[in-house]
Amino acid sequence: MSDKSILASILCSAMILGSLGASVHAQTPSSCKGTHAGAKGAPLFSPPLASVVTGTRRVQFYSAPNLHCPINGVFVVPKDELVTYAQTRDGWSSVMYANPTTGNNVSGWVRSARLKQAGTVGPKQ
């Protein structure tokens, strides 16, 4: 099974759980309910940035900008394209990944060091 099919399966499972009301965040520690994109510590980019995953290994998604808050089984792989909405000063980015095959998407936080800016999303001003 290819990395993209595994990711598609994981994203599909996450979407099904979300639609059934089973929040991915339901059993996370209270520290995982911290900073959200647009908060003082993570100002929004306007327009959002287009980013590409770099490196050779997969990048874990987190429910909050905290290493103790992984979203189990949700990750992206090198060369995947993300929309980056915000970034903290301590190296976290609020992102969304849209699977080009299924159209499913997932949002969360990833380590900024693994992203390369590829432009902006939206109209040029």
What are these model-predicted stretches?
Residues 15-24:
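C-terminal segment of classical bacterial N-terminal signal peptides
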Residues 71, 105, 118-120:
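Short acidic, gly/pro-rich beta-turn/loop elements at beta-sheet edges
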Residues 13-16, 50, 103:
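N-terminal start and proteolytic maturation junction detector
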Residues 110-125:
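Short, low-complexity, Pro/Ser/Thr/Gly-rich segments in the mature regions of secreted, periplasmic
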Residues 28, 37, 73-113:
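SH3/SH3-like beta-barrel superfamily modules
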Residues 26-75, 85:
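N-terminal secretory signal peptides
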Residues 1-11:
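Bacterial N-terminal signal peptides that target proteins for export
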